[in-house]
Amino acid sequence: SLSGLSKVSAFIHRADIGGVLNVSELNLIKRLIQVQNQFKTFYNQLVEEDEGVKYPILDDKMNQLPVLTDLFQQINETCDTYDLYDNASYELQGIRSKISSTNQRIRQNLDRIVKSQANQKKLSDAIVTVRNERNVIPVKAEYRQDFNGIVHDQSASGQTLYIEPSSVVEMNNQISRLRHDEAIEKERILTQLTGYVAADKDALLVAEQVMGQLDFLIAKARYSRSIKGTKPIFKEERTVYLPKAYHPLLNRETVVANTIEFMEDIETVIITGPNTGGKTVTLKTLGLIIVMAQSGLLIPTLDGSQLSVFKNVYCDIGDEQSIEQSLSTFSSHMTNIVEILKNADKHSLVLFDELGAGTDPSEGAALAMSILDHVRKIGSLVMATTHYPELKAYSYNREGVMNASVEFDVDTLSPTYKLLMGVPGRSNAFDISKKLGLSLNIINKAKTMIGTDEKEINEMIESLERNYKRVETQRLELDRLVKEAEQVHDDLSKQYQQFQNYEKSLIEDAKEKANQKIKAATKEADDIIKDLRQLREQKGADVKEHELIDKKKRLDDHYEAKSIKQNVQKQKYDKIVAGDEVKVLSYGQKGEVLEIVNDEEAIVQMGIIKMKLPIEDLEKKQKEKVKPTKMVTRQNRQTIKTELDLRGYRYEDALIELDQYLDQAVLSNYEQVYIIHGKGTGALQKGVQQHLKKHKSVSDFRGGMPSEGGFGVTVATLK
């Protein structure tokens, strides 16, 4: 937790110019160091647990954090949250000890006075209290003359006097002197601590800056998690695609999310629809999400959002009238629009709410279209809301302009807040009037008063709305299926990676064990060869056979037929006879068989050495044989079936099996064969049919009839 962090740069600067920090200010500096150290520890543990994960930004921040352990210890050992410790210095401890003992003597003296039976009726209360930092007792005014001492205060009624008895005056004076000495010593200690702070001023300022940045990053992360935000993809080309976006200040559980998209070649979107239908909220949602994304925040949309970077976001939203300037609604809007048009460029996003409102409808609509034309020439991306019907036809007369609308539910007489991209808003006056009970005669007569073109336009818009809803439903289902498929793919990829890592670790372990065995065996072999050389040097060629056999036996003790070093199948032959050339497996050397001693042993000459060896340790050298020409014979028809079942085969194995089968079927003079691949996911069926399409022996193929196995079978016709 980063709670308790405060801005301390002002304290650090004051310490640097010779000021003295108090205990509270020192504790805020101590808290900064404490939080920094705790965060470092947490981050190091995080990195150790997630070895494969990299945090380059946080790594950079961690490397910037200074070491301030000494300063933390100095402050921590000197004071708590409220005051200096008694043992902050030897002098302070002595002063406070004297204050404590003197206070105790004063209390004892005053306790005797207030507990005296003779004084009970003279005191307002049998207690010791403090006035003006002096210990006093409450005496009734009429008994003032019975107590020798100094009056420090009296009650509001004047009935009680607070008197410091003369017996404790000197002790109270001593307390005052000690308090003065204590203040001087505390000032000295605080001055010393302030000097330590000044000495580490640069490091402290860096710590404050870095921890402030980390606090900001964590705040962004927590906010993004609270809105379940997603990371947008930024593109160089101008793009806005926000799937199921919603206003960040609205409750995600109840808000209606809408997909906001500027399709390719679309620069202007005009939203029409009923008042309070969500047009303005849509504008604000787009503007806020753009600013959030460019500020490094995750945004309230589904995964897959795409955005480009805008240099400026201009908006004219709401009726911000200026009372001082006495501007009307129209004038207020126009003032903002004029300023926007002065500064907007092709890298800007412009949002207009109720463009052209507040004046004559015909003039307002004409002005709105002219403004939109001007912004389009500038090249800005524009989203505007309006209730003017003239603007519905605007998009059909100009390239790069799209209509959109907010849906209205006639049955409930309320907006649904759903945004329909590509569908202009339509008038619902007749339907609403009918729902509210207006006479059909009146409604029908009203319909005759509007032109045929307008009727057709409304009917066209109604048809577009129905088609849009159907397509949107299908798209959402497709998005869901794609997301599920991606999740399955990710899960399988992770499992495959885990399997590969496990396989790699097994191989590495096996290699390590094999290397250890080979190393030990090699060392032993080197020792034996060394002994053999010494024997030869000592006795020349006159080496006793039993001496060689003894050395050979030491090698045999370390030889394993199934070791990793010789993990190959030995070749065995019917018989080894005298005169055969052989390979001695245990030595890896060639030799010639001189004599067969018995069924198990033979005498072999290897260079100048003659040895008796086990026959099973000998491998006969096979001479190269000329391979005979193979005759291709046609197999009997009855040995090849007219169907091939590939169910259960892996994809590559299935295609190999299919090739072999087709060759045999052609040799058997079959005209038609049945390939059974099953239904499954369809991958094997697709692979088989693509393979048949390219095969030189196949003239045609088709899917199986229901009686032949349906989609699980492909019937191939052979040439």
From Swiss-Prot:
Residues 644-719 form the Smr domain. Pfam families: MSSS, MutS_V, Smr. It comes from Staphylococcus aureus. Endonuclease that is involved in the suppression of homologous recombination and thus may have a key role in the control of bacterial genetic diversity. The gene is mutS2. SMART domains: MUTSac (SM00534), MUTSd (SM00533), SMR (SM00463). The keyword Hydrolase applies. It comes from the Bacteria. Homodimer. Binds to stalled ribosomes, contacting rRNA. Belongs to the DNA mismatch repair MutS family. MutS2 subfamily. This is Endonuclease MutS2. Its EC number is 3.1.-.-, 3.6.4.-.
